[in-house]
Amino acid sequence: MKQIFKVGDQKVFARVVGPEDLARFHGELLHPVYSTFALARDFEWSSRLFFIEMKEEDEEGVGTHLSIDHKSPARVGENVIFTATVEKMEGTELICTIEAKVGDRLVATGKTGQKMLKKEKLSRLFGQR
C-alpha cells in the first residue's frame, strides 16, 4: 500500500441525484429525495477515491465502518458535493470524515473506514478459489 496521503488531505466527488437514488423499499417509493442508503454508497465511494491511488496491484480495499447523520433532503436534479477528509491512518485502515452538501446546505455528515488487504487473503475470506 502506497503511503501517499496524510491527515487533512481531501477528495471531492460530485453526484447529481437521480431517480435511482430515491428512498424505495421493495419497489415502493417512500420519499422523492436522496435516500440514506444511496448516501451510504456515495460516502463509501468518496473515501475509496483515496484507495484507488494507494493500492498496489495485489491489493484491494474493503469497508470496515460507515456512519451517516442525514441532516437535510437532496432532491432529484440537485448536485451533491461529497468531501472526504483523511482523519487518520491506522496500519492499513483509512478513516475519513465525509461531508455532503448541496450548495451551502449540509445534507449529511459521517465517517467511513476502509482497510487494505491482499487480494489473495480476500479470496480466502470470501471462500473463492
Language model segments and positions:
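Catalytic strand-loop segment that frames the active site of acyl-thioester-processing enzymes
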Residues: 1-36
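Hydrophobic residues positioned within well-ordered beta-strands of beta-sheet architectures
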Residues: 13, 64-66, 82, 96, ...
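Flexible, active-site-adjacent loop/turn segments at secondary-structure boundaries
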Residues: 20-23, 31-32, 60, 115, ...
